[in-house]
From Swiss-Prot:
Protein name (database record): Type III pantothenate kinase
Primary location group: cytoplasm
Annotated binding of K(+), by residue: 117
Compartment(s): Cytoplasm
NCBIfam families in the record: baf (TIGR00671), PRK13320.1-5 (NF009853)
Enzyme class, first EC level, given as a word: transferase
Catalytic activity of the protein: (R)-pantothenate + ATP = (R)-4'-phosphopantothenate + ADP + H(+)
UniProt source species: Flavobacterium johnsoniae (strain ATCC 17061 / DSM 2064 / JCM 8514 / BCRC 14874 / CCUG 350202 / NBRC 14942 / NCIMB 11054 / UW101) (Cytophaga johnsonae)
The encoding gene: coaX
GO cellular-component term (any): cytoplasm
Length: 244
């Protein structure tokens, strides 16, 4: 069994895998890390490996405390990945983005793939049908857009995510919701349209904390999976074992 962990900017997601099957997903706060990992291991005592995407120094020490029980692996740029990294600055490419690209390469072979991760930031990562990682884009996520409007203006309120009533906002709150949510959706659809106009045999994978909210609002056909990173971690780790 493998325990995969995704340390996000706000929360931690985890999953236990046996082979290619997921047994259970978990979500918890960063300050609960060690306690919750201990609980997971009590429930799944046959876990042999702990695999982590990207992590800060504080969290890393917490994970290392489990080294006596598990094989602990932090993915780095030195690991083997199932794609050719054509990024102009490969060492600056986030490990989480590399894991997503690896998962897309392994799950959807011989296709052009665009992975969209809608979290604190939204990232776009493109892997062509020849398994070349070419790059993508980064822009603010939904929450960051709400916070930016509040923090960098004198009077605009800080709102939480909500579906706008219309694209024409008839109040300040509705105008903000329309600008943030509709603008976000138009951005994603615009990127997808641009890729579609240049590449055929194409699949779009949408993941991240806001994936479910966005999936039903996009005009393009997508494969939505909010746990794609955790699944990709398990698959990429198995790929590493098989190819080391």
């Amino acid at each position: 069994m493998i325990l995969t962990v995704d340390v996000g900017n706000t929360r931690i997601k985890a999953a236990v895998f046996e082979g290619s099957s997921v047994l259970e997903y978990f979500v918890f706060e960063k300050n609960e890390l060690e306690k919750r990992i201990e609980k997971i291991l009590e429930k799944f005592p046959n876990c042999s490996d702990l695999v982590v995407a990207s992590v800060g120094d504080v969290e890393k020490q917490s994970f290392l405390s489990f080294e006596k029980q598990l094989n602990v692996h932090f993915f780095t740029h030195e690991d083997i990945f199932p794609f050719h990294n054509k990024y102009a600055t490969p060492k600056t490419l986030g490990i989480d983005r590399m894991i997503l690209a690896a998962g897309a390469t392994l799950q959807f072979p011989k296709q052009n793939r665009l992975v969209i991760d809608a979290g604190t930031c939204i990232t776009y990562d493109f892997i062509d049908e020849n398994d070349n990682y070419l790059g993508g884009a980064i822009s603010p996520g939904l929450r960051l857009r709400y916070e930016t409007l509040h923090n960098y203006t004198a009077r605009l309120p800080l709102l939480t995510l909500d579906q706008p009533h219309s694209y024409i906002g008839d109040s300040t709150a509705q105008a903000i919701h329309s600008g943030v949510v509709n603008g976000f959706v138009y951005e994603i659809d615009g990127f997808i349209d641009e890729y579609r106009s240049n590449f055929s045999n194409f699949i779009i994978i949408l993941t991240g904390g806001d994936a479910e909210f966005l999936a039903k609002r996009l005009k393009n056909t997508i494969f939505a999976n909010s746990n794609f990173l955790l699944e990709s971690l398990s698959q990429t780790y198995q790929y590493k074992i098989d190819n080391d």
